[in-house]
A protein has these predicted regions:
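Compositionally biased terminal segments of proteins
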Residues: 1-211
């Protein structure tokens, strides 16, 4: 929140941002351990206010970081904080929570999975599959409504699950599970069955996310 204040002070008085990623799914469903923080902002200019190379407030937090055009990753001893440029894909895509006495826009499970699949579905991680499987089970209707964002990289996603199984399996088994402990093959089968429900035409209609 200190860095959000930097955006508020030096950039936009009331910046729009959302809290998402695997840690939010952990807070919602207690499925696996996750310590990393994912903050999504629609304006790429906001990254400058959280970049230790530019911002004293950010450099006071850490000098270990990565910067790219679309995100800034802050590396801390207890985890990472990613500031990522992305608009919400679903509507509204968040719920209002109070965290540390502050109102926070916390992404819905469907929005989290939609972002994962839209932005990096062509390079899935074991945790991405794990999270997808959870949300398919817990919120199938919400995920169905977000289907157009799930199938942009569907063929590549499913091919990698099959062809890179030997690489992904040990990483999947290393996930620190909490209240959800399916097998890799179960999750891969569930993801395949779910994603195959959507016609290819849905992907063709959606060449880019809504502005």
């Amino acid at each position: 929140l200190t860095l959000i204040d930097e955006i508020r002070i030096h950039g936009t008085a009331n910046p729009f941002w959302t809290f998402g990623g695997g840690t939010v799914l952990m807070l919602r469903y207690g499925h696996r351990m996750s310590k990393d923080i994912d903050i999504f902002v629609p304006n790429p200019q906001h990254l400058g206010y959280v970049n230790p190379r530019i911002s004293d407030a950010a450099s006071d937090i850490t000098t270990d970081y990565e910067e790219h055009a679309e995100f800034v990753k802050l590396v801390l001893p207890d985890g990472e904080i990613d500031f990522v440029v992305s608009r919400n894909l679903t509507t509204p895509g968040f719920d209002e929570w109070t965290l540390m006495d502050h109102p926070v826009k916390v992404e819905t499970a469907a929005e989290i999975v939609a972002k994962k699949m839209w932005h990096r579905g062509d390079r899935p991680t074991a945790r991405d599959l794990f999270d997808l499987s959870l949300v398919i089970e817990r919120e199938p209707d919400s995920l169905m409504a977000a289907g157009e964002f799930l199938i942009r990289h569907r063929e590549t996603f499913l091919r990698i699950l099959d062809e890179h199984r030997d690489f992904l399996l040990p990483r999947f088994n290393d996930i620190r599970t909490l209240g959800y402990a399916p097998s890799f093959d179960y999750c891969a089968g569930l993801a395949t069955e779910f994603l195959r429900q959507f016609p290819k035409s849905a992907a063709d209609r959606r060449s880019r996310p809504r502005p």
